Amino acid sequence: MIDDNKVDDALEYLRTNASKAAQARAHKVYVEEFRKTVKAQQMALRLNLPVNAQEREAYASEEYQKHLLAIKDAVYQDELNRWGMVAATSLIEAWRTQNANSRSQGKMQ
């Protein structure tokens, strides 16, 4: 049986972490989109090269590599929040099913 206190904790987790999860998602989207800006800035530093060489050098740049690490961190935080929310929601759903089953068994007796 799932303890009511665990359900209360799950509900509290959902309530208190909603803003944090939204911020993590917004940051993830931002850094993913900003990747294009980093690439463009790096390509602009090499206007003397053909476009495909500019792109190659932009991808190989230290700034682009650092930005990829920022994307990695943002995705990790977003997924950590998402799976915390999924776990809390799943616990609540299991508790609801458990209670519905208990009620239906009580009516059968």
Describe each region flagged by the PLM.
Residues 1-19:
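Short, charge-rich amphipathic alpha-helices with coiled-coil/heptad character
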Residues 47-76:
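Short, glycine/alanine-rich amphipathic alpha-helical segment
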Residues 10-11, 61, 97-105:
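Short A/G/S/P-biased low-complexity tracts
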Residues 3, 17, 51-53, 67, ...:
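Generic alpha-helix initiation/capping and coil-helix boundary signal
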Residues 25-28, 32, 36-37, 69-102:
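Long amphipathic alpha-helical coiled-coil segments
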Residues 28-56:
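Extended alpha-helical coiled-coil "stalk/arm" regions
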Residues 1-4, 104-109:
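Short acidic DE-rich linear segments
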